[in-house]
Amino acid sequence: MSVLNREQNLVINPALGGTALWRFACGYSPKDMEAQHAPLPLLFIALPIVLNERFRDIVLGTQKSRGLSAFAEKFYLTKFKEVEKDEIAAISRGVPQYRKFTLNSIAVAIRTNLISLDADTARILPMHHNNIKNIPKSVKDILDASEKLGIWCRGTDLAAVQNLLSVSL
């Protein structure tokens, strides 16, 4: 295995992906709103966004209260020089590219009791909301971005998410 492949496996692995999806589910279903759970298809947009450093930085740099539309808007405004207008297409391309990885990450998250899948409703619920302590900043950023993305998706219906991010789920 090459050094690059080994580094990718250390950073992009189903355990990290599963943990990020758990934080997404926590954002979507906060403790005080446990009856509202994330639709399974939404999990397929989370990893292509939060595991991409550029997109993750944009999520982290967007105010939580502004929502998903403010994140998507940054791809269309010319004043944001760090983002090219056609980069939102990279999210759309990332969804099918990450599909198998996302499925593996979901499986890990379920096996480790981070999330549960309601087979009747195809919704994901977090098994707990405990914070993880003493983690590297790079991992914390991924988890924080994932949770924020979950919060934003909670306030946006599935069709609007697909439209804003130009994705097909």
What spans do the regions from the language model cover?
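Short helix-coil junctions and helix-kink-helix linkers
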Residues: 87-99
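Basic amphipathic alpha-helical segments that dock to polyanions
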Residues: 102-113
